[in-house]
From Swiss-Prot:
Its EC number is 3.4.11.18. A divalent metal cation 2 binds at residues 142, 211, 244, 339. It catalyses: Release of N-terminal amino acids, preferentially methionine, from peptides and arylamides. InterPro entries: Creatinase/aminopeptidase-like (IPR036005), Met_Aminopeptidase_Type2 (IPR050247), Pept_M24 (IPR000994), Pept_M24_MAP (IPR001714), Pept_M24A_MAP2 (IPR002468), WH-like_DNA-bd_sf (IPR036388), WH_DNA-bd_sf (IPR036390). This is Methionine aminopeptidase 2. GO terms for biological process: proteolysis. Cotranslationally removes the N-terminal methionine from nascent proteins. The N-terminal methionine is often cleaved when the second residue in the primary sequence is small and uncharged (Met-Ala-, Cys, Gly, Pro, Ser, Thr, or Val). GO terms for molecular function: initiator methionyl aminopeptidase activity; metal ion binding; metalloaminopeptidase activity. Binds 2 divalent metal cations per subunit. Has a high-affinity and a low affinity metal-binding site. The true nature of the physiological cofactor is under debate. The enzyme is active with cobalt, zinc, manganese or divalent iron ions. Most likely, methionine aminopeptidases function as mononuclear Fe(2+)-metalloproteases under physiological conditions, and the catalytically relevant metal-binding site has been assigned to the histidine-containing high-affinity site. Keywords: Aminopeptidase, Cytoplasm, Hydrolase, Metal-binding, Protease. HAMAP family: MetAP_2_euk. Substrate binds at residues 111, 219. It comes from the Eukaryota.
Amino acid sequence: MSACTSFLRVAGDKVNLSFSSNSWRTTSEEKRYDERMANEDPEKTYQSIRRAAEVHRQVRQHARRHIRPGMTMTEIANNIEDGTRALVEEDGLLSGVGFPTGLSLNNCAAHYTPNAGDTTVLQKGDVLKVDIGVHVKGRIADSAFTLTWEPTYNKLLEAVKAATDTGIRESGIDARLGEIAGAIQETMESYEVEVNGTVYPVKPIENLSGHSINPYQIHGGKSILLVKNDDQTKMEEGEYFAIETFGSTGRGRIVESGEVSHYARRMDAPHVPLRLTSAKTLLKSINKNFGTLPFCRRYLDRAGESKYLLALNHLVGQGIVQDYPPLCDQRGSMTAQFEHTILLRPTVKEVVTRGDDY
């Protein structure tokens, strides 16, 4: 892909907000909003997220055309990330890849990207989740889609896309997170998938969630589960959310499984003396290249780091870096994901990553 300096020809969907009986907000919520707005010019952050989202649309358009069975996971990841870096005009911590490209296959739903030496090849029968992040000045456009090359799992993809669209529709200023989750669950569970003569209900993955997004922090603290719950927390004006849903033909519950590839420096990392010189050196590199943005082992390789696993595991053990293992449902099941980033402006819900594709 060639570099592009004009990113703002599309700005996603805008939906006018209607205010419900939940429209009264507590003093503490108003105070938090005032504090957020005091620290940033909204119009500038809007332009940053829109630029990131436009790059996302262009990168994924290319990816959807070119990803094919027979490619390695490393080829796919490099193509997406190199395209992102070129289009967003990567500039240190000012703009670049928002997080490692997720390429989770089949029963694995999230947090897989290839490490160096991974020779996994995409197969025709695979269900591939493609989760791409782009950031401009720390504002992360987080959006994902699922690809399949056989019609067997089309209904699974349809269910998850519909559930994500439901989550977006139900979101807005003062919407309660538990109620959004209930609507997502209801939509998802209205679908079923037939595989080799056996009918499977589509289940929302109960221990995965959408999330708020803060500057340079992909998981901002608020979570939108995919099953109904009693969370009375409200969405607030000025917030960004990744509305994402995952559906499964399996148990509808994931566990950590497989080799870790995803990491991030913790926002609340303790100040602890590091006894390993290699850990101190690696932490300096992480701070310089990623800050609190998620990264993977391939990104450390690209930054010139080598023989770093002992140091990296030490940083994890000290609570300075968080590791994120792959998240998988039972073997033999299939999972799908769709996701968009939304921005809650005072009178408009802007689906910044919306495109012609999804």
